């Protein structure tokens, strides 16, 4: 049973379904870039079997919190492992680095096999169940990626104007441009 970050909720919930309890640490409607875990959240991590976080710099607090835990049995997975990160992302404070919004392109979302594998490792008795659900999730992501590509391919103008420059991975996949205005 493990607390996880919002972006990482879909696959564990789909993979684990009735086999595990999946808890979201970051409350709905809260800005994840600024969120900090409470003492209760850290206590919950001490009792968790698995901790899944997005990575790529999204959760600035992860290293310090993980370093403070005494739970030596906690399986930790960074969901963005294996994804080529976009560099040159400028955050709200003007700092430039890797773009943490990797999940906003369906092709990246289906690369969450590392999440499925940690669930299999933490609960070997249900490993086949987790793998089958991951495979279904990957197919759904592939279908969504195809739908995006087909729907937008005929558009003459593929520029996307947003209030938060979070869609770079999706724009790369669709060969469009994103700009914060």
Place the predicted regions along the sequence by residue.
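Extracytoplasmic metal-acquisition and chelation regions
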Residues: 1-181
């Amino acid at each position: 049973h493990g607390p996880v970050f919002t972006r990482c909720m879909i696959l564990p919930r789909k993979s684990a379904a009735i086999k595990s309890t999946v808890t979201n640490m970051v409350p709905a409607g809260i800005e994840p870039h600024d969120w900090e875990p409470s003492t209760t959240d850290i206590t919950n991590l001490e009792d968790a079997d698995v901790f899944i976080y997005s990575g790529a710099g999204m959760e600035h607090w992860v290293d310090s919190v993980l370093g403070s835990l005494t739970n030596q049995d906690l399986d930790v997975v960074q969901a963005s492992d294996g994804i080529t990160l976009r560099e040159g992302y400028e955050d709200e404070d003007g700092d430039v680095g890797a773009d943490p919004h990797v999940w906003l392109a369906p092709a990246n979302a289906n690369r969450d096999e590392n999440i499925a594998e940690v669930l299999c490792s933490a609960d070997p008795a249900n490993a086949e169940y987790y793998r089958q659900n991951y495979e279904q999730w990957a197919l759904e992501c592939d279908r969504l990626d195809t739908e995006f590509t087909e729907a937008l391919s005929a558009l003459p103008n593929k520029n996307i104007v947003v209030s938060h420059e979070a869609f770079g991975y999706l724009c790369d996949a669709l060969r469009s441009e994103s700009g914060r205005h």
